[in-house]
Swiss-Prot record:
It is found in: Mitochondrion matrix. InterPro entries: aa-tRNA-synth_Ia (IPR002300), Ile-tRNA-ligase (IPR002301), Ile-tRNA_ligase (IPR050081), Rossmann-like_a/b/a_fold (IPR014729), Val/Leu/Ile-tRNA-synth_edit (IPR009008). It comes from Ciona intestinalis. A motif ('KMSKS' region) lies at residues 298-302. This is Probable isoleucine--tRNA ligase, mitochondrial.
Length: 413
């Protein structure tokens, strides 16, 4: 293929690779590849055996392996400025200007995200896909279109990263040799840790000092700092919950969750169960929609569109703005909602529900008013109602003949 010269390190050459992630309808049609810093780039790198060595550390700073003069510079500020200066020095910067473009941001901090590779633990879901598909072929979902959605998500998921770097969580019980980096994880070390956790709790992993069995030299190893993905935690809940009196796992009659769990709890439970016992952990899936705001947006504290049910039922600090509609109005709104679809909620919607409840109350009051002093002992028995009905018809017909002066020879009912 085509070979290009590096714009900064002129002695280096770069191989051109064709891919559909770049096209001529947007930009120049040519983009750089950073296999260690992007999902698409990583996929292309794997396909073409490109290096995935990272050039940015976990603090967002350039590392020495990319260029000594860039080491320690933050990529979004001084690092960018240094790269621009290096391009200028080599006379390879044709134009520079600021412009707006799409870029991923963290939804919590609202700060830009930079992706980089790191060593993680994975489950090869491709090896479980066929077994998982076979296991859910007999599963019933409510609504009935859920299986296809779940199958689509399974087919798109080739690997499942089950490790996370957090300050809390269930640790992955692996040890690393301090010199060689070789990992230590076997039945002996697991059983030893199980006994420690049963005695001291899960925090023993972070606080304990004698975590290895006596046949190992603990001074040569260090504990891992990774924790399990919370979806792996919840995904094996069936192993604790669904055990019978003989300690055998069984299938749950129902798993009930939101529609987003086709790629979450439903899937993680399926994969772990199929991998460990060869069957799905459930017989049926019940899927519900979500409660959205009046405009159909997901409610979020950061956006400020959360509807407080306590304010709707009991009223807010300002009764004129937030009157109390009562619990029955909220119950009515729930009762008339479709469980499988997203539903909207707002003050206006609950006000309408309260009006519906008031109409029902008025109707009930009317009926109760008509039943005032009602005595069930005075109710005419059902068999006697026929005689009364015949008598009424006779009297009605007789009255008509009398008023019309038209008597028949034989008057009967």
């Amino acid at each position: 293929g085509m070979i290009c010269r590096h714009p900064i390190y002129l002695e280096r050459t770069v191989r051109m690779i064709g891919s559909d992630i770049a096209n001529t309808s947007k930009g120049t049609g040519v983009v750089h590849i950073a296999p260690a810093h992007g999902m698409d780039d990583f996929g292309i790198g794997q396909k073409h055996n490109l290096s995935t060595e990272s050039s940015v550390n976990s603090d967002g700073e350039f590392m020495a392996n990319i260029a000594p003069n860039l080491e320690g510079k933050f990529i979004f500020t001084s690092g960018n400025e240094a790269v621009v200066e290096m391009l200028k020095e080599e006379m390879n910067l044709f134009h520079e200007h600021d412009y707006k473009h799409s870029y991923p941001y963290d939804w919590r901090t609202k700060q830009p995200i930079f992706v980089h590779t790191s060593n993680q633990w994975f489950v090869d879901t491709a090896m479980l896909a066929n077994k998982a598909e076979a296991a859910i072929s007999g599963i019933t979902t409510y609504p009935d279109n859920g299986i296809s959605s779940m199958l689509n998500r399974l087919q798109l998921r080739s690997y499942w990263c089950i490790s996370r770097q957090r300050a809390w969580g269930l640790p992955i019980p692996v040890f690393y040799h301090k010199e060689s980096g070789e990992l230590l994880l076997n039945e002996s070390t697991i059983q030893h840790l199980v006994s420690l956790v049963l005695k001291h709790g899960a925090d023993i992993w972070w606080e304990g000092t004698e975590l290895l069995p006596t046949q190992y030299n603990a001074d040569e190893y260090e504990r891992g700092r990774d924790i399990l993905d919370i979806w792996f935690d919840s995904g094996v809940s069936w192993d604790c919950v669904l055990r019978d009196s003989k300690n055998r796992t069984t299938q749950a009659d129902f798993y009930i969750e939101g529609k987003d769990q086709y790629g979450g709890w439903f899937q993680s439970s399926l994969l772990t169960s199929v991998g460990l016992q060869g069957v799905a952990p459930y017989k049926n899936l019940m899927v519900h929609g979500f409660v959205l705001d009046e405009k159909g947006q997901k409610m979020s504290k950061s956006i400020g569109n959360v509807v407080d049910p306590m304010v709707l039922t009991n009223g807010g600090k300002n009764p004129q703005r937030d009157p109390a509609y009562g619990a029955d109005a909220l119950r009515w709104w729930v009762a008339e909602s479709n469980v499988h679809q997203d539903v909207h909620i707002s003050t206006t919607i609950i006000k309408s529900a309260a009006e519906s409840v008031q109409k029902i109350r008025n109707s009930v009051r009317f009926m109760l008013g008509n039943l005032n002093e009602f005595d069930k002992m005075k109710i005419v028995p059902t068999p006697a109602m026929l005689i009364l009905d015949l008598r009424y018809r006779f009297e009605d017909k007789k009255l008509w003949y009398v008023t019309s002066m038209n008597y028949p020879l034989n008057l009967s009912v």
